[in-house]
Amino acid sequence: MKTIITNKKAFYDYSLEKKKYQAGIKLLGSEVKSIRIGKINLLNSYIHIKNEEAFIVNMTILKYPFSCCLAYDENRTKKLLLQKHEIIQIKNKIKTEKLSVIPLKVYFNKNLVKLEIALSKGKKQHDKRNALKDFDAKLRIQKTLKNFNQKQ
């Protein structure tokens, strides 16, 4: 499994549920080549469910520089390949718990492009500050323990 891109902003802006889903993406050949060289952006992208089908919106895949023929829209809506029971499960959670679905990372699994998605709830500003404080405190503790162990 080779990770191409991770949506780091998602971990900061959203509180994620533990269950994550793996979805395939319906792409063109030149889009796959472009993803392979890392020309992809997940910022501001989200998953939209319509008519029992899942779509990813605002995922930007830049044009492959060596492609001669196919011109495509870089921000086009792409269909996600999920099992029907997973789509129904996600749709029910969105309705009942007021959650949103966001992409976490894009990776290759046996030469197939996969997308890891998760249900999430947006964090408020004070929650983001508290998360940063906790992270800084953990870093300080690790540094002091490391220095203490080196002195002995």
Curated annotation (Swiss-Prot):
InterPro entries: SmpB, SsrA-bd_prot, SsrA-bd_prot_CS. One of its GO terms (biological process) is trans-translation. Transmembrane segments: none annotated. It comes from the Bacteria. Keywords: Cytoplasm, RNA-binding. The keyword Nucleotide-binding does not apply. The keyword Cytoplasm applies. One of its GO terms (molecular function) is RNA binding. Pfam families: SmpB (PF01668). It is found in: Cytoplasm. GO terms for cellular component: cytosol. Gene3D superfamilies: 2.40.280.10. Required for rescue of stalled ribosomes mediated by trans-translation. Binds to transfer-messenger RNA (tmRNA), required for stable association of tmRNA with ribosomes. tmRNA and SmpB together mimic tRNA shape, replacing the anticodon stem-loop with SmpB. tmRNA is encoded by the ssrA gene; the 2 termini fold to resemble tRNA(Ala) and it encodes a 'tag peptide', a short internal open reading frame. During trans-translation Ala-aminoacylated tmRNA acts like a tRNA, entering the A-site of stalled ribosomes, displacing the stalled mRNA. Belongs to the SmpB family. This is SsrA-binding protein. It comes from Onion yellows phytoplasma (strain OY-M). The lineage of its organism: Bacteria, Bacillati, Mycoplasmatota, Mollicutes, Acholeplasmatales. The gene is smpB.
